[in-house]
Amino acid sequence: MRCLFCRSDDTKVIDSRTSEDGISIRRRRECQLCKRRFSTLETASLTVIKRNGTSEPFRREKVVTGVHKACQGRPVTKADLAVLAQRVEESLRASGNSQVDSNDIGLAILPELLRLDQVAYIRFASVYQDFDSLEDFSRAVERLKNQ
């Protein structure tokens, strides 16, 4: 790591701490040449490969937005959705891949949403899994009943 002040490559890590969300690491560093201290925040990037082949950085806000519609009229708070998005991101990062398909995001959302609200789960699953008949809904409800 280069010193922000004198541009020397000779720096030493004094302290490292994981952020509260567990996604980034804050490091306190000291330049061995000028002795000044500075902090860095390090995160591993997570890229989403969309269905059309384009890529974009993972954003929790998109998870919240996608799940919000399924939760309308349900007893689900914004804080609940924020926690769900954090868990989804943690699950995706735990896979060890720096790139994930948009399909993987949907698969990571389903169990978290099921834990949060069964009706919202059915709503989200009906769109995500492209339900096109009453039988699709019935099978999904039966699976929930049998759990």
Swiss-Prot record:
DNA-binding as UniProt keyword: yes
GO molecular function per UniProt: ATP binding; DNA binding; zinc ion binding
Organism of provenance: Tropheryma whipplei (strain Twist) (Whipple's bacillus)
Lineage top rank: taxon: Bacteria
Task performed by this protein: Negatively regulates transcription of bacterial ribonucleotide reductase nrd genes and operons by binding to NrdR-boxes.
Domain ATP-cone: 46-136
One BP annotation, GO: negative regulation of DNA-templated transcription
Zinc finger (unnamed): 3-34
UniProt xrefs under PANTHER family: TRANSCRIPTIONAL REPRESSOR NRDR
Family: Belongs to the NrdR family.
Keywords: ATP-binding, DNA-binding, Metal-binding, Nucleotide-binding, Repressor, Transcription, Transcription regulation, Zinc, Zinc-finger
Keyword Cell membrane set for record: no
Cofactor(s) in the UniProt record: Zn(2+)
Cofactor, free-text remark: Binds 1 zinc ion.
Protein name (database record): Transcriptional repressor NrdR
